């Protein structure tokens, strides 16, 4: 499935919605790598073709654009030197005036913004204070008798006038403070702009900035390469750890036991009507032609019976019992309802309606995560998250009971979420 997406450079929006944030980041990173690889390959072919004379080098087209100088009365190019013309001010004076005007306008703009903020703060401050005081007075007014209400009203008006007077004083102090800040800021901006004008004549700063940007860009590329290498080393470590813990050995033992116990396998599939006992070492029926993607529930049910039942998908290891974590074709909302009242680490596996595979729904401390499991090939693996490939679906689940799914999330499968209704939601898959 991932190879098909990278080949077409397109992913279905419905399938994209099923991916988690980590899966989306990894998928977009892979697509960007594929774009760079194609571009480098095309550039190499073009260079090789030009070197061997198979393709002529690109020639710049002649431009129709031209420049025409303004001529004076004497027929020469018209030139005006600022500050040297009749009635012109000296260049230094013009420059000083421009800098002073820019500083004044900038300081005025900043002062207006500061005053708006200050005025809003003052208004809010006294509005809140007045509201609190009114609330206090209102509470007291309910306690007094009818003859005291007039006195309370007079007191309220006096307090209101006092607050208004204090507000006016605060406004005057705020305006004076803003005015002083405006003058100070105008002076600072004047000297800042003056120094910037003097320094702008040297080009060494621009050169150093360009070199610094280039250095940062190279450092960022190296950091991304190191992160990718660390991720590959982490995945390789998980694979080696799984081999050391006997996952592969257990898989071989399972196939040997299945090959030696055909009668037990026949009794298992005798319970499923219209399904013959398959051999554990043989592939799916070649008369079944799988579409590019699931089209309907009927097609998904047939795919499961034709391709997944022979691979014992959904069964416990070395038994004929269906795993407690296995569910049928249920929606994302139904899966989250089942996991709602369970603790962090609870999980279930449901048959996907978007891809040929499954969706592992995981319970977080707050919320849920959903991982797509690709089963379109001869193995089972998480789509875009974990490069490890597993021979059976049960191997994948058992592996991640001991190893986390993603390094960033630290998801570890702990408690399976079983069935709640009768018949179970997977009964159509085994009829």
Curated annotation (Swiss-Prot):
CDD domains: SH2_SH2D4B (cd10351). Keywords: SH2 domain. Coiled coil: none annotated. Residues 211-235 have a biased composition (Basic and acidic residues). Gene3D superfamilies: SH2 domain (3.30.505.10). Residues 325-417 form the SH2 domain. InterPro entries: SH2, SH2_dom_sf, SH2D4B_SH2. Pfam families: SH2. Residues 201-235 are annotated as: Disordered. This is SH2 domain-containing protein 4B. PROSITE patterns: SH2. The keyword Lipid biosynthesis does not apply. It comes from Mus musculus (Mouse).
């Amino acid at each position: 499935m991932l190879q098909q997406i990278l080949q077409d450079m397109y992913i279905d929006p419905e399938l994209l919605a099923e991916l988690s944030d980590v899966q989306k980041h990894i998928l977009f990173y892979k697509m960007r790598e594929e774009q760079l690889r194609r571009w480098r390959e095309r550039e190499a072919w073009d260079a090789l073709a030009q070197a061997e004379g198979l393709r002529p080098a690109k020639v710049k087209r002649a431009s129709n654009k031209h420049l025409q100088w303004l001529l004076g009365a004497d027929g020469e190019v018209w030139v005006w030197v600022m500050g040297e013309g009749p009635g012109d001010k000296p260049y230094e004076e013009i420059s000083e005036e421009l800098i002073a005007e820019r500083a004044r306008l900038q300081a005025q703009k900043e002062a207006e913004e500061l005053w708006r903020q200050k005025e809003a703060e003052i208004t809010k401050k006294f509005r809140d204070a007045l509201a609190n005081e009114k609330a206090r007075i209102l509470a007291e007014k309910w306690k007094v008798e009818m003859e005291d209400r007039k006195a309370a009203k007079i007191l309220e008006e006096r307090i209101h006038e006092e607050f208004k007077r204090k507000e006016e004083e605060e406004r005057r102090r705020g305006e004076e403070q803003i005015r002083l800040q405006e003058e100070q800021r105008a002076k600072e901006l004047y000297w800042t702009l003056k120094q910037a004008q003097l320094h702008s004549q040297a080009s060494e700063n621009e050169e150093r900035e360009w070199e610094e940007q280039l250095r940062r860009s190279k450092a960022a590329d190296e950091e991304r390469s190191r992160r990718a290498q660390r991720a590959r080393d982490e995945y390789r470590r998980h694979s080696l750890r799984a081999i050391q813990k006997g996952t592969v050995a257990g898989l071989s033992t399972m196939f040997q036991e299945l090959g030696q116990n055909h009668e037990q396998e026949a009794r298992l599939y005798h319970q499923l009507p219209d399904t013959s006992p398959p051999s554990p070492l043989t592939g799916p029926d070649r008369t079944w032609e799988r579409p590019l993607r699931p089209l309907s529930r009927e097609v998904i049910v047939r795919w499961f019976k034709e391709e997944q039942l022979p691979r014992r998908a959904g069964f416990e290891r070395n038994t004929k019992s269906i795993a407690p974590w296995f569910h049928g074709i249920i929606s994302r909302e139904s899966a989250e309802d089942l996991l709602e009242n369970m603790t962090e680490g609870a999980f279930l596996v449901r048959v996907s309606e978007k891809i040929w595979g499954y969706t592992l729904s995981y319970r977080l401390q707050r919320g849920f995560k959903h991982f797509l499991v690709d089963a379109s090939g001869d193995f089972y693996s998480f789509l875009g998250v974990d490069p490890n490939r597993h021979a059976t679906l049960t191997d994948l689940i058992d592996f991640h009971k001991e190893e986390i799914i993603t390094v960033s999330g630290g998801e570890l499968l702990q408690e399976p979420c079983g069935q709640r209704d009768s018949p179970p939601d997977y009964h159509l898959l085994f009829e």
